[in-house]
Amino acid sequence: NNAPLGWLEANVVKFVDKDHIWHTDLKEVFHLFLRAHTGGVNYAHLFKIEIQDDQSMIPSLEHTPSGQKISYIPFPGGHLKFFIIYDELTRFYWLVSNQATDSMRRVSSLSNIKRYGLPNNERHRLQLHFSRNCVDWCFAGMVACSTNELYSRNYPSAVIKGDDLHIVCRSADEHALNPQYNNMITHHIVSNFRQLIY
C-alpha cells in the first residue's frame, strides 16, 4: 500500500486571465496540477509546460509572486485524484476532490475503520471548491459524504451542462473489496452550481 513518493494524474489548465501572474501571451503555456503522493494532505504538484515553435514541450517549475520557484502548492484534496474544470461563463475554476478530516490517525488503527492504505486516504467525502486563479480556493460544499469509509466516492470527473455540474466517480458500497478497489460508478448533479459562488 505504500507506493513511492511522486506525482500522478495531471489536470491541464490554461490561464486565460491576462492579469494572472502565470498568464503570458508570448508562448503557449499550460500548467499541470498533479496529485501529490507524499503521505501528507492538501498539496498538489505544479508544473509549467511551454510549447515551443517546433511543438516540443519544455517542463519547468513555476514561480511565486516573490520570484521563488514552486513545486508543491496548497490544494484542497491534492493528495488524491482530483478534477479541475473551467467555467467560461463565470471565469471560475471548479475543483472536485476528496476531503481529509482524519489524516493524523495511527496506521495501526486503520483496519478498525476500513481505511485503505495510509491515514491520508479518506475517500468517502467528495468536496467542491471554486477559484478565480487555481490558487485561492473557496469551499462550495460537499458533493457526497458518508460516515462509512467503505462507501468511497473518489477519482472524480466533471462536465458542465447548462446550469448544472455533473460529476461521475468511482464508488464503493459494502460489496466492494475496499475503498480503493470499487464496484460502482456513481453520477452526482450539483444543480445551479454557479449560485454557490460567494
Task: Report each predicted region and the residues it spans.
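Beta-rich carbohydrate-recognition and catalytic domains
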Residues: 1-9, 13-76, 87-92, 98-149, ...
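Transmembrane beta-barrel architecture of outer membranes
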Residues: 79-81, 123, 153
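C-terminal structured interaction module
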Residues: 150, 155-159, 166
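Conserved beta-strand position repeated once per blade in WD40 beta-propeller domains
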Residues: 9-11, 81-83, 155-157
